[in-house]
Curated annotation (Swiss-Prot):
Group of enzyme by EC: ligase
GO MF assignments: aspartate-tRNA ligase activity; ATP binding; nucleic acid binding
Name of the protein described by the UniProt record: Aspartate--tRNA ligase, mitochondrial
Annotated region described as Aspartate, given as residue ranges: 216-219
tRNA-binding recorded as keyword: no
Length: 611
């Protein structure tokens, strides 16, 4: 019996002779001249103890792709070598009798050992830059040797857990008779938001495909095609600046449902899916329905549209408590009652410096400062304010630390200055043991709803942009505001957030072609050439498209969360660097000039110099 994977239960094989194939682990222990211990790792990352008691003749397996010269040289130097002399991470086949380890040496998952009688070297490992499980080399070396890193049981487990989660997703939607449809990866360039990856067309000179940022338009077309409820685990691409939680290509759980016009119909499906996945991965039963909060409440209380609601430290929007100012400016405040004197003035100032954006702070340590603290904050110094009234309404007292800033009423990003400071403050207070550490197994899911349909933009030729994408339907009560007050229109959009992480977002879509046309042309004021890129969608909506809505969940982030991985890089087989490079295979790479000519593409001198 030759095994490349150790059975889950080895007990029935005890006392029998077996052959096992795998990688020789670097760890070894010589206990005497004739006895040594080694370890073998199988394809699932499982480790088996090897006991070698005699000199074993090493058999070399001849492979057809190995030259005769190389083989002869290897054989002449290794015929009489023992197991100890084989380089770690070499692929071997060991044969021997399986035994239970002595009782005092048994540990869970390490209860058996193989008494080695024969060894075959299947492939020798040479010139390794790192070994599995070695985290000391820098990230670039780790990613350049990702194939070695993935052999480590931890990384092997991440990918296998991700695979099992994907199976649960497929099973969930199959049970509900959703239709899995694979939408094209060669799409067209449309102004949906993020920068796209483009692919030149050889057969259509001067024209390009674009890799999809999401299957958004295709899945809406499927709703008009009579498919009904659709899903897929979809590959998506965005050519944007990367962070630790972003990759240029990523995976999402994508779904769309026809004949729905209310967000709760989509939300119920998503909650059922997440309940199933969390139960499967962690054995935790989530309570339904999940909490709902409005976008405005999330911004005012947590300073973020993806709030971490596991802890308090609430913000307060005090604009209404102040004399009338610029209507486009909001004033927010965070009061921390430092009863244990855990935060020094220097630490408070350092937090403000870390955030920037005109955040200021003052501390109230004496009774006399209760009347004077407002004069220490530039935002309040010139205003006719009675400190006593603010103290009462904001529960400010002795040992209060007050952080404050002014910010735009309509946000360009999803986090306010004090929203950033709130997270840093909590992290610092936990580190100083002024607040308890968060339970790592606590999952606080929350729906954020009633987002603004449009947001300001910094582009000179466009005053507003879609907060999410231009296909989101306006809230029924706000349709009349589209023409005159678009920034006041709420969208039928919903984000699912857990522990401060945005897992996904969706919306009820515009299915009326007239409203879709009005949003694109009259509200967003797209120039004619950009509007033309959506004509196919207008035509589809005009053909009898039912009401519909959907959502996309980030599968990489979800897998990282449910496997307790530090980030998404761990649950992606071959992740890119922050510059978008795959260091293992060397992409992106230059293309021969003759191939560029086939695609009618020319590289400018400026581009060549930059590279």
């Amino acid at each position: 019996m030759v095994l490349s994977r150790l059975p889950a239960c080895l007990l029935p094989l005890v006392g029998t002779k077996v052959s096992i194939q795998g990688w020789l682990v670097a760890t070894s222990r010589q206990v005497s001249k004739s006895i040594s211990f080694h370890q073998l790792r199988d394809t699932h990352g499982t480790i088996l103890q090897l006991l070698s008691t005699d000199k074993i003749i090493l058999q070399q397996k001849r492979e057809p792709l190995v030259s005769s010269t190389d083989f002869s040289q290897q054989k002449s130097t290794s015929v009489m070598r023992t197991l100890s002399s084989i380089p770690p991470e070499s692929v071997v086949q060991v044969t021997g009798k399986l035994q239970r380890r002595p009782e005092h040496d048994r540990r869970p998952g390490n209860e058996f050992e193989l008494h080695v009688e024969d060894v075959k070297l299947l492939n020798v490992a040479k010139n390794l830059q790192l070994f599995p499980g070695d985290e000391k080399p820098g990230m670039r070396i780790q990613l350049a040797n990702r194939h070695i890193q993935l052999r480590a049981p931890k990384y092997n487990s991440y990918l296998r857990q991700r695979s099992r989660l994907a199976y649960q997703v497929h099973s969930f939607f199959n049970d509900r008779e959703f239709c899995e449809v694979e939408t094209p990866l060669l799409f067209k360039s449309t102004p949906e938001g993020a920068r796209e990856f483009v692919v030149p067309s050889r057969l259509n000179p001067g024209k390009f495909y674009a890799l999809p940022q999401s299957p958004q338009q295709y899945k809406q077309i499927l709703m008009a095609s009579g498919i009904g409820n659709y899903y897929q685990i979809a590959r998506c691409f965005r050519d944007e600046d990367l962070r630790f939680d972003r990759q240029p290509e990523f995976t999402q759980i994508d779904l769309e449902m026809s004949f729905v016009d209310k967000p709760h119909e989509i939300m119920e499906v998503v909650e059922d899916l997440l309940v199933r996945l969390v139960s499967f991965a962690k054995g935790i039963t989530l309570a339904k329905p999940f909490q709902h909060i409005t976008y405005q409440h999330a911004i005012d209380k947590y300073g973020s549209d993806k709030p971490d609601i596991r802890f308090e430290l609430p913000l307060k929007n005090i604009t209404s408590l102040l004399p009338k100012q610029d209507p486009l400016i909001s004033t927010e405040i965070l009061v921390y009652n430092d009863l244990s004197h855990s935060l020094s003035n220097a630490e408070s100032r350092k937090l403000c410096e870390a955030v920037g954006e005109n955040v200021v702070v003052t501390s109230i340590r004496e009774h006399s400062q209760l009347q004077t603290w407002v004069k220490k904050l530039p935002q309040l110094r010139q205003l006719p304010i009675v400190a006593e009234e603010l103290n009462q309404k904001l529960q400010i007292g002795i040992n209060s630390i007050v952080f404050m800033t002014n910010r735009p009423k309509y946000l360009v990003s999803g986090t306010t200055p004090l929203g950033k400071l709130r997270l840093l403050l909590h992290e610092l207070l936990v580190k100083k043991k002024a607040l308890p550490e968060l339970d790592k197994d606590l999952l606080k899911f929350v729906w954020v709803v009633d987002f603004p349909l449009f947001s300001p933009t910094e582009e000179k030729n466009q005053s507003i942009t879609s907060t999410h994408h231009p296909f989101t339907a306006p809230h029924w009560d706000d349709v009349h505001l589209l023409e005159k007050k678009p920034l006041s229109v709420r969208g039928l959009h919903y984000d699912i957030v857990v522990n401060g992480i945005e897992l996904g977002g969706g919306s009820i879509r515009i299915h009326n072609p007239d409203i879709q046309r009005f949003v694109l042309k009259d509200v967003l004021k797209l120039p004619e050439n950009r509007y033309a890129t959506f004509e196919h969608l207008i035509r589809v909506l005009s053909s009898g498209c039912p009401p519909h809505g959907g959502i996309a969940l980030g599968f990489d982030r979800l897998a990282a969360l449910l496997t307790n991985a530090p980030g998404i890089r761990e649950v992606i087989a071959f992740p890119k660097t922050s510059s978008g490079a795959d260091l293992l295979i060397g992409s992106p790479s230059a293309i021969p000039e003759e191939m560029l000519k086939d695609y009618n593409v020319a590289i400018t001198r400026q581009t060549q110099n930059r590279n």
